[in-house]
Amino acid sequence: MIEVKDINKSFGSNHVLKGISGKFEAGVTNLIIGGSGSGKTTLLKCMIGLHRPEEGTVEYDDREFTKMNFEEKIEIRKEIGMLFQGSALFDSMTVEENIMFPLNMFTEQSTAEKRERVNFCLDRVNLESKNELFPAELSGGMKKRVGIARAIAMNPKYLFVDEPNSGLDPKTSIVIDELIKEITEEYNTTTIVVTHDMNSVMGIGDYILFLHEGKKFWEGSNKEIAHTDIQELNDFVFASRFMKAAKGKF
């Protein structure tokens, strides 16, 4: 479980996060949603240590991350897998080398052991035998799956995913969403997904934290989200044509 308590973060005079609190449980798909500028990506960066909040705490299974020293944070980061918005693959490396990168950094495994782990991860995301391809040879969906394979290479307790469906067609987006949910449940990871995609929200949102203008406006499940009387949330949820058409069916 990851818990954030009263997180405040500013950049100069811009108060981006205003007292955000929330609990993200293991084994379920946790989503942070909101419009552009709502603070969701800043919150994620505070949670993984890329930003330091002025106030508040981030706790990993009751371990207070925000007060740890550098060496202690390194140990936590070994337990974190991260899928970046653009997949962030190294163009000059093969698929195998990309997935092996965290293993090279954080383990003392033999080359054979690392290659075995790479093959396992590729098989898990249905990309077996793609080891020697380069990112330029992959489709957008395949790049995302390689990114997921790299994110789970260290068998992480915590998985962070930033806008996984950005740039993908609807069919591929569903595949990626289902893969994230399967991995979360299979390995009992604490998974946190930042997204503005309502298809993802309705498909895999076990727990949802809605941010608006840097504040937490609502939290709940995808079964509850269409039945609130919070105007800001309704404006966000029903902004898409799909959700407007589906509104009467909930």
Task: Give, region by region, the residue ranges found by the protein language model.
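Helix-to-loop junction immediately C-terminal to a conserved catalytic motif
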Residues: I48
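Helix N-cap at the start of a conserved alpha-helix in ABC-type nucleotide-binding domains
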Residues: P170-T172
